[in-house]
Amino acid sequence: MSKLFISCALPYANGPCHLGHLRSTYIPADIYARYNRMTGVDTLMVCSTDEHGTPIAVRAEQEKKNPKDITDIYHEIIGNDLKSCNISLDSFRRTTDEIHYKMAQDFFLDLYNKGYIYEKVIDQLYCDECKRSLPDRYVEGTCPYCESEGARGDQCEVCGRHLNPTDLVEPHCLICDSTPHIEQSKQYYFKLHEFEQPLKEWINSNEHLPKNVKNFAKEWLNDGLKDWIMTRDMNWGIPVPLNDAEGKVLYVWAEAFEGYQSSAASWANKHDLDWKEYWDDKTVHFIGKDIIYHHTLFWPSMLMGRGWNLPYSVVGGGYLSLEGRKMSTSKGWVIWVEDFLKKFDSDLLRYYMVINAPLNKDTDFSWDDFQRRVNNELTDNLGNFIHRTFTFTNKFFDGKIPEMGSYTDEDKEFEEKIKALPDVVANYIDNFQFREGLQGIMSLTKEANKYFNDKKPWKGVKEDIESAKTCINLSNQLVHVLSIVLTPYIPISVQKIRKVLNMPTEHVDGFMKFEERTPLVKWDEAKEFLPAGYEINSAKPLFSKIPDEIIKEEKDKLYSLEEENKENEDDNMSDLISIDEFGKVKLVVGQIKEAQKIDGSENLLKLQVDLGKEVRQVVAGIAKRYEVDELIDKKVIVVANLQPAKLFGVESNGMLLATDSMELLTTEGNVGEYIK
């Protein structure tokens, strides 16, 4: 039997799961795992909470807690979130587990002994007040490239530039707010540059890497790879296993990857199995697109250094925005999984997160669209077809599937589509095209409703019983197929269908129990039709419509939480300006004529904007929100009387108005027209 190792990106243990986490990583991974189990693949799906790193350490110091106290809380919360969404993990562990410490240190030592890790003396910031070195997140200051304040020691959120703490202008310690100074420190570096050519060969030759993942990795490779720091001067983390490395821990990205393997090892040891057999056969990583870089360059190079098999694929899911705006936990613009599931079934979330957009694309969660899809697609389309099939069978055929009657071209075409569906869906899932597989299912159920309406079996039982028999037989056959091919997508709802069909039902809620790893219903059973005379049970509607008032409640709650956070940020509105001050701002309608990315920045675009009497060069931080091509000829609102500023070394002569989520404010006004 072939084996499969599936890993889910490690959730960081400083907060609960929100809907974006489920959409990009955990739901797709679960679909893939459930499908593979049903096809007979011995599947192991693992995850751990990521519990080290500076954000947790900084928070613990600010709250005067032990970091472990924080991670204890969120490990449990995150685990409950994933269980509630029926993510069928075989193992959910922690990077604070003893076995993880040992495996991560062994990995480091192996690379060190092979000569892939070396010592290097670097400049670091040191706080005299705290009497210690300051790793990245312990420092904030002004970005040297775009001059934005509040840039972290590892990255500027405004221009997207990756930073070192020593790059910051006017840095200050986040713990005591004092100004640090530069001191030299010995750290350990991984020879990433030595793996540049092998990485290129792996990425170019790997046909299983999704296009978005491959393209992202190639961009970084084209810029050349620099050696990568593996250690930090901290007291929270996994100690560097060398005699002369006291006070140093492994950088979180030097050990978090190992969380996949240590989680698997914990599970395997418990059940007297070998986790590496799964790894060596086929490994697939499910992650968010923000860590594609780490999983296609850092991690594979470490595996090459160790002499271990590389992943079969890395699947990077896109971002989820909320009501057209970027999610922000600090501003309350977020939906937590726990809150969502207080009102709605997990299958509704799973369905909506998959059907909304291809996994490799960013998408948006809208309460109105969620209601529309549940009511129109799940209730009126899928649920309606299944319920009317069951109801009609029970009412007119004594709860037994009738034998086939007359057989028209329409019947034959419908039957062929039913028989083809399992392979169609399987092909999509095999290629990580989960939305396309679900679309194929929903498209056929829509056709099935039309087929049912066109055949009019309610008239046929009186006027053409042979036609009615065929219609109801084929409709039941499709429902039987749906009870299997929908299992990876909406596992709880499927059990209700199977119960009516007298099929084996399974415990699909929560994490996977070892004794239940082998599914009771196999994928290929969808290719077998039920015999005439097969008896079904009585049925209830599978889904219910979501009323308008429920959606209104959720929207009101979302906006009230955001407003509450705004009030907490600034209770007294101390930054009010007068009408005279505002009158000095000149807003002009402009039209974007050219747009190009700025080398080295993930967020900034250089734009040429026609203002009527002149064309202005404007630098805007919208690269993560817009593709270059979609900006051309877009009419925008420009603040035209700002002093010139250099962002990332490029002069900007104006500013575009945009929302917090970087959505540009547009207008139908004439180019060059002033806005008052």
UniProtKB/Swiss-Prot annotation:
A single GO CC term for this protein reads: aminoacyl-tRNA synthetase multienzyme complex
Could you tell me which CDD domains the record lists for this protein?
A: Anticodon_Ia_Met, MetRS_core, tRNA_bind_EcMetRS_like
Where Zn(2+) is bound, by residue?
C143, C146, C156, C159
UniProt short sequence motif 'KMSKS' region, positions renumbered to this chain = 326-330
User: Cofactor stoichiometry and binding?
Assistant: Binds 1 zinc ion per subunit.
| Record note on quaternary structure | Homodimer.
Family per record = Belongs to the class-I aminoacyl-tRNA synthetase family. MetG type 1 subfamily.
Full protein name: Methionine--tRNA ligase
Q: Which gene encodes it?
A: metG
